[in-house]
Amino acid sequence: GRAEDLWPEHQGFDVNIAGTKNGHPAAGYFSPYKNSRLTDGPKGEYLTQRLTDEAISLVDEYSKQTAPFFMMLSFYTVHTPLAAPEKDVQKYHAKMRKLPHDKVFQKEEQVWPIADKREVRVKQNHPTYAAMVNQMDTQVGRLLAKLQSRR
């Protein structure tokens, strides 16, 4: 329908991997993805890693050419449904257990003036969210390392 007209390949991009009308991974972050724009990987493959693998393959392909190229990589992370590899989630469960008691609050850092200063919990109970951010950071690092190796 109309939404498909707005997909990247109809807006000047040569390649669109995994981009659909959904702003989130409809079937979750682990293969099978049930995404018409991305073939399923091995069962249990993590989407953030897969998108990085695809981006690295494109860097390899396009860097053989002399013309510059533009790549836009948008991870679905950290959108719901929250999910990450279990070893990463366990890492942040362990870190969370080492933090002070759950009732400890502190003033939220303000980067601009705000009328209502709020307090936030020191101990956040979001190990899966933290694991997703960690995975995204790791994958951005992989892609940057690939780009650096191509200089």
Residue ranges and their predicted role:
Residues 3-8, 15-151:
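Active-site-proximal cap/lid insertion segments
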